[in-house]
Regions:
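N-terminal secretory signal peptides
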Residues: 1-14, 25-30, 41
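Non-catalytic carbohydrate-binding regions of carbohydrate-active enzymes
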Residues: 485-490, 494-495, 506-516, 577-609, ...
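Active-site neighborhood of glycoside hydrolase catalytic domains
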Residues: 483-486, 493-499, 528-530, 537, ...
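Well-ordered alpha-helical scaffold segments within catalytic/enzyme domains
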Residues: 365-367, 402-413, 478-492, 509, ...
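C-terminal region of N-terminal signal peptides and the immediate post-cleavage residues
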Residues: 32-45
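Aromatic-residue-lined binding/catalytic grooves and analogous aromatic/hydrophobic interfacial grooves
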Residues: 44-467, 485-487, 504, 553, ...
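Acidic/histidine-rich catalytic neighborhood
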Residues: 505, 509-566
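Short, glycine/acidic-rich hinge or "gate" loops at secondary-structure transitions
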Residues: 373-381, 498, 515-533, 572-576, ...
Length: 806
């Protein structure tokens, strides 16, 4: 994609009155309580007992390193912390602790309602906008230069949500902890020591948009505020406290002298509000003042209180899933994370504990980036500058969907809510932009019928309802299907009622878009009339004006089915549901090409695109959809999907490999699914495809340049779970694609299964030993493994333990 698309204003901007009326109609102001998480005021829940793991516990869920990250390698080497809204990359240099702080709502741009000359949407940092950094915080301790210390070690403790570093200097053991507390809404850096040492140095706070930092000597704090040209206000603050030594402000720095301990507290945010009626801003919120209040309030509590509050809150989510994929060797365990990553690739030996750690790292990132605020964007809240690739936006043709495939599968259903709330809050503007701009005569994707209703999106979306780059007609269906799948896991009727306006509007859009076409039935040779999607592009290759692309046909089929079921469950719109049923019955469904043997991507027997293209758009009916199933679909259809997946290849990058792995798991090809996971675990060197030192997934865009894209960090763990358990409504299959590397023994607790169940599972020698199925709203399902089935009938909260699968 290009960073800039020159455009000329060609039509009036979106009607503010229209947006307000649409916002009121869908009740979007309820989507985050009308306030950003930054403005939340609920008092933190303080634990009454220590939540800390005992010494020696959690050793398999620690990433560790022998050197800090440098200022120019933060994105690849720094360790991430986050509280769901506020995130930071932490460098851990003993003498120069550096934190790159970002806020998920720190966006330039706006509604972006003036089309380019080709009828598509502008996609630049000023019109569409971009996520940007909030601040840099530096703690300088000059005496502790790296050359004067020994036994240096830094860790990311996934089980407790802590970044720690330790070293010895002049016989004194020094340690620091960094964490992002959701209850206190702050980032905390705690310095301690054993052996009579002390800290002397300074704390600095610097904005990234030329702000001026001010000091408040009365509160030993620093802060700044600013405003973008789009009217969004932002601010940040930092304070420091010690129970010994001296802490003062001098100029624009906090100065600490001979402190045996030190606590640095950081907060910040914007006046963003997930409310279209308010223009996505809270006019009464002063972010700089609120940041100052938050750091001053937090620092009044003891370091232990802040630590325990964070760890108890974090573990409440993280402990929902424990996983073992088998034992690693003592030699593997002795390696630091980077050496272990390299050894896994160089030696080719399975490292089950490390592979399980990678899955848990994905869960850590989800807890840290999707909680009570906006959903996870392309990089989450972890930036190393103000110009992230693709604006750090939301891509609607795989990326945002993949970000949430893991959540319900890995005991993180609560973290899905940010995605739901986002879609609801954007719906009024999405609807207005669709109805006022989509049928522009210059838009090559416009509806041939001339009619328009409902809503859709573009390939890129921002946080103001704005759309960017090209129109993406099928994007509405894929967003809705992802929202629906969350209902399948949770059986949450409140969620279903919330998303119903999205489903309804998407169906209305497709009712105006589908075209009648006459085709010849491959089996009977007779002609019949079918409904096909209007001109579209199969992401992101091939012709840009093809009708009936498989991608659209599959997604719309599922959308219609989900809308009908939602209407029945909620007792709504029976008449329109019947209309949708009629449309669904007439939809053209893709065929296998007699020429290539592949499932057709276009209504053509020819391959009109790139054989090994990264996207698997024509396979959405295999994953994430359920239409193509090895155990229930026609053999020719399954073979056609398998042949297409084979042709796409096994050598790609990040999210493309993750999607391939998920598809191979669905086809029960365990070793192919596993190999793609391992391919994503190859070390990224000089920007090459693979995992960076900090396990962020890197996509190589050119020689020596790689981009962090977070979706693979979620999609790859989702594939690992799909290898252990497959579910669809009424059906659970255990160990459908267990690779040889994990077959010796293993266990996992907390796997989500569709129809409202959670499964704990253990196995030995490739066979299920025991499975406990618990209802979280589901009633009946069938559990199968190795050709043996058990029918389960439970009430919510009940569980049953199943054996006898051998």
């Amino acid at each position: 994609m290009n960073d800039q698309h020159p455009h000329t204003p060609a039509q009036p901007s979106t009607s503010r009155r229209r947006v307000l009326s649409l916002a009121a109609a869908v009740g979007s102001f309820t989507a985050l309580g009308g306030l950003p998480a930054f403005a939340a005021t609920a008092p933190p829940k303080r634990p009454t007992t220590s939540p800390m793991l005992a010494e020696g516990q959690g050793s398999t869920t620690r990433m560790w390193y022998r050197a800090p990250a440098g200022e120019n390698t933060m994105l690849e080497r720094a360790l991430p912390v986050g509280n769901g809204r506020l995130g930071a990359l932490v460098g851990n240099d003993p003498s120069h602790e550096l934190l790159f702080v970002s806020d998920a709502t720190m966006w330039t741009g706006g509604i972006n309602d003036v089309l380019d000359q080709d009828g598509q949407l502008p996609y630049g940092r000023t019109d569409f906008g971009s996520l940007t950094q909030l601040a840099h915080v530096t703690v300088d301790i000059p005496e502790h230069d790296l050359g004067s210390v020994n036994s240096y070690r830094r860790e990311l403790d996934l089980a407790q949500g802590l970044v720690t570093s330790s070293y010895i200097r002049a016989g004194v053991s020094f340690e620091r902890r960094v964490f992002a507390s959701q209850p206190d809404d702050v980032i905390v850096v705690q310095f301690s020591q054993r052996g009579g040492g002390h800290y002397t140095g300074t704390v600095s706070l610097d904005g990234t948009h030329d702000e001026t930092t001010s000091a408040d000597g009365a509160h030993d704090s620093l802060s700044f505020g600013g405003q973008f040209t789009n009217g969004l206000r932002y601010g940040a603050a930092v304070t420091a406290h010690s129970m010994s030594g001296s802490v003062t402000t001098q100029g624009s720095k906090i100065v600490f002298t001979r402190c045996a301990d030190l606590t640095v507290v950081i907060s910040g945010g914007t006046n963003y509000s997930a409310d279209a009626q308010a223009g996505y801003r809270d006019p009464d919120l002063d972010p700089a003042a609120l940041a100052r209040t938050k750091v001053r309030t937090a620092v009044r509590h003891s370091p232990t209180t802040l630590l325990h509050t964070h760890v108890a809150d974090y573990r409440d989510q993280f402990d929902g899933m424990q996983i073992s994929l088998g034992p690693s060797t003592a030699e593997q365990r002795a390696l630091d994370t980077w050496e272990r990553l390299k050894a896994r690739t160089q030696q080719g030996e399975p490292d089950p504990e490390f592979e399980a750690l990678y899955l848990q790292f994905g869960r850590y990132l989800m807890i840290s980036s999707s909680r009570g605020s906006l959903p996870v964007a392309l990089q989450g809240p972890w930036l190393d500058g103000n110009d992230p690739d693709w604006m750090g936006d939301y891509h609607t043709d795989i990326n945002i969907q993949m970000n949430y495939w893991m959540a319900d599968r890995t005991a993180l259903s609560r973290n899905f809510d940010a995605f739901t709330d986002y879609c609801l809050s954007q719906l009024p503007v999405w609807t207005e932009l669709t109805q006022s701009l989509f049928n522009d005569p210059r838009n090559r994707f416009r509806n041939s019928s001339g009619k328009i209703a409902g809503w859709t999106v573009a390939y890129s979306t921002n946080i103001y309802g704005g759309l960017g780059w090209w129109w993406h007609p099928s994007g509405n269906a894929w967003l809705c299907n992802t929202l629906w799948e969350h209902y399948e896991y949770t059986q949450d009727r409140q969620h279903l009622a919330k998303i119903y306006p999205l489903l309804q509007g998407a169906c209305e859009f497709w009712e105006t878009r589908l075209l009648t076409m006459t085709v010849t039935d491959a089996d009977t040779g007779k002609e019949r009339e079918v409904l096909v999607a209007d001109k579209d592009w199969s992401p992101e290759h091939g012709p840009q004006d093809a009708r009936g692309i498989t991608y659209a046909q599959e997604l719309v089929r599922d959308l219609f089915a989900h809308y009908r079921e939602a209407s029945a469950l909620l007792g709504r719109n029976a008449a329109y549901s019947k209309t949708v049923a009629g449309l669904q019955e007439r939809l053209y469904m893709p065929e296998v090409s007699p020429k290539t043997g592949w499932l057709q991507e276009w209504m053509s027997p020819d391959n009109l695109g790139e054989t090994t293209h990264r996207h698997l758009s024509p396979l959405v009916g295999l994953f994430p959809g359920d239409r193509i199933r090895p155990d229930a679909s026609p053999a020719a259809l399954v073979k056609g999907a398998t042949e297409l997946l084979t042709a796409r290849g096994m050598e790609n990058f990040g999210w493309a490999n993750a999607w391939r792995s998920l598809c191979w798991a669905r086809l029960k090809h365990a070793e192919n699914a596993y190999q793609l996971v391992i391919t994503n675990l190859r070390p990224s060197v000089d920007g090459s495809n693979g995992s960076a030192m900090n396990l962020f997934d890197i996509y190589e865009t050119g020689k020596g340049r790689g981009i962090f894209q977070i979706e693979s960090n979620f999609g790859t763990p989702a594939a690992m779970i799909e290898m252990l358990l497959y579910s669809r409504p009424g059906h659970i299959e255990l160990l459908p694609a267990l690779p040889a590397a994990w077959a010796r023994s293993g266990s996992v607790t907390g796997i989500g299964a569709r129809s409202g169940f959670v499964v704990d599972l253990s196995w030995r020698d490739g066979k299920v030993r025991e499975a406990t199925v618990r209802s979280v709203g589901g009633r009946r399902t069938t559990v199968t493994a190795g050709g043996i089935s058990h029918d389960v009938d439970l009430r919510s909260g009940e569980s049953v333990t199943l054996r006898n699968f051998r």
